[in-house]
């Protein structure tokens, strides 16, 4: 070939490359999301075309033009190759090359300028203004769709940008009244209609399977520093202002069925943007439920969202299924200030590459931009983008957790509070579902049924038209966070301690992952780690209390303007925090004290004491409610009253005043129960001395022909369990108010009588006790009767002991056997229902099968599959060993399986104390019975009576004592197996039984010594009355010395049981 032909070939090549450049610059296939393309690719193509004729002169680059992030951190050479897809260093370390670091450039690249020009031309503006628009950061260039190109985030969103003054929209364009709790952002930048269309067109070009939502800067709110990316199988089918939500189509449909009407999507990126008027019409959402409330807004303030069309699509509150780590919040002085830290969002890579890797990043802006000298290793975890991997297991709510497993998907953003607790790992609608499935039927923290709560109470106006609605927003936020705190600490973990994932720590996550992979499960944390995590829990609890208390001054100033719905949510939050303390067994009187103060300020006690209109409280408006519920969807034209009630809160408050009143009474009763529980568990005086005897029947029981809107639960069977739990709380209140150390100041009346109201519930219900609360109530009653019997063995004034005969021994043995029997039944129910007292999705409560024969009766017939599922749960060997596998068809405890109880830890501590004190009594009583039998046998021979009757009676008593000892052995075994969620982790230890005794010495030593606080108080009072206490001597007593010593030990046990009850169980 001649030189001329070579030159012609070279020129032809250059012409071809130039034509390719020109055609590709005008083609949307080569352009990125905004019509831009990389200048580096054009330069490489032109260089190849220029040197196409001279192959010897062309030199391909053998090394990467840019080192990957891992090699740059280690400051080593990177030999990344497009063919291999990974460099040598990353392959040895088992990592993948990532090019996520943003290069610090002085200005935008040519690609960004060109891309911006194209997007501006689409929106109808001049191309000459592209250079000035890049500086404002309004548009971003997207990477090319070419597979070999390096995906780099746009530079413009990392540049510091001022917050423009928001433009004013027409008042008619804003929705007048929202029933959906959502959050607004103050100072949110509003883009024009043209910029909105260019944004949406840029997102829909060449990226058919992705959503790119960009965060814009706002006053007081640092901008999000990366685009939010949705996977190809996680299209946003529903929208709202909660970022923590499932993204799959099936899961969205399931949530929509659970919550009613979810609002439609903010925008459809697969279609061109609608006109501004149509967009404004789409903004008028249907009234949603609790899940569409307020999204990510500052925990320390009341920022607001302006009603801008553009701000909705670009605000941080848009739906984010794969949001990784939230913005950290810091305390601020004002309620309208918020400090957040930037987060990094995951990216979508081509299908032939590994799944996207999400890097947990909690650094500030400077560290995000340029700090490459960080020494800590940042943990990466894999999040699957396929629908099969994102699908949760059947019957299980997918909890977003920090895990490297592909089956564990991140459902949403995790809001890291200033206390270090990570909020937002469970979607809001699932929080409500979990509460009503596992918690409500044992103890109704929210004393209303699920339908009323989701359709009425939580539908609060939160549109930022006044400070009242911002208060509503704030109250709903911390109610939601408190509910999540409860569910998170009671949720069963797959491995590790139950405090895992409470805090956001990269190093702890990495160490837990390595430990879990190596050990195949959880490992025992050290004491220092336990103390640290306990401190995190206490800090998170105190933070929830502090936040909800901080709003009280504003609440008090506007109490006449705030809706009763918000008041119910506000007071329920305090009940919820006290419930958390009871579940984990933590003594924090400050939470109860602040709750008592808030309830007192609301004057709720006046309703409980001076309002007797209880019978008519739930009957008002029953017919109207039923009619409006039945004809709400079909006869909208004839439901003017229903519409005015839905929108006019004043009319709703007047119509439902009786329903709100009885709800407030229920909340006050629940707070009194927690006050009584804390008084019995930890001692000390009561803070609320309002009597609540009969409150379960007055305020909680469903009455005939009552309005179903205000009932606690729709199911009669579940209502039966709720009433028994509340009635047990009434018994605790009665016992705490009748304590001898407070009521009997004269020290003359050592015993007191139980009201017949409490005895009726135990003896007249059913032949078989099946509810845990009912068994615990029976345990308290039998325990009191047993203590009274022991204290009556010795006269309080003279100290004389009675004559020991078979009748006295029979009474003691009967009460002791009843006590151990009821303890065994209670522990058996605990073992059957929930031995860990935590939430397990694989161990759900059985749904009752109701029938309408008697109105409030429940069927006790269960299907075979349900019975078998109840039998196969747990460890079969121990169930057979302890006799726990009874016929499930005749046992209603299957309805309570998996449910958690606030009484569990407190009652377990008391059971341990009682068992530690009475464990030696059966052996001692056997000796007393044999001695009495010998004495009576000699007396019968002298009086010519039948000695066989006495022998038979003594043998019967010995058999009962032997069975009692057998029950004690099973009780000890069950106490070792039942280990509920506990803050201190000491109650589950075998050696901690004596740690909860109120005396300063162990039981074995204190039994041999005359030591009892209550005994010292009573005997000192008797000495002041000039009646000296005289111990009977062996010569004055007809009994043997050993029998007298045994009776004295029994009396001392009675005093110590009284000490335990008066001074606290813990």
UniProtKB/Swiss-Prot annotation:
Residues 68-97 bind DNA. The keyword Nucleus applies. It is found in: Nucleus; Cytoplasm. Residues 1-11, 42-57, 118-131, 139-148, 260-270, 314-327, 855-871 have a biased composition (Polar residues). Residues 328-350, 622-641 have a biased composition (Low complexity). Residues 1-70, 108-153, 214-285, 298-399, 616-645, 849-871 are annotated as: Disordered. Keywords: Activator, Cytoplasm, DNA-binding, Metal-binding, Nucleus, Repressor, Transcription, Transcription regulation, Zinc. Pfam families: Zn_clus. Glucose-responsive transcription factor that regulates expression of several glucose transporter (HXT) genes in response to glucose. In the absence of glucose, it functions as a transcriptional repressor, whereas high concentrations of glucose cause it to function as a transcriptional activator. In cells growing on low levels of glucose, has a neutral role, neither repressing nor activating transcription. Belongs to the EDS1/RGT1 family. This is Glucose transport transcription regulator RGT1. It comes from Zygosaccharomyces rouxii (strain ATCC 2623 / CBS 732 / NBRC 1130 / NCYC 568 / NRRL Y-229). The gene is RGT1.
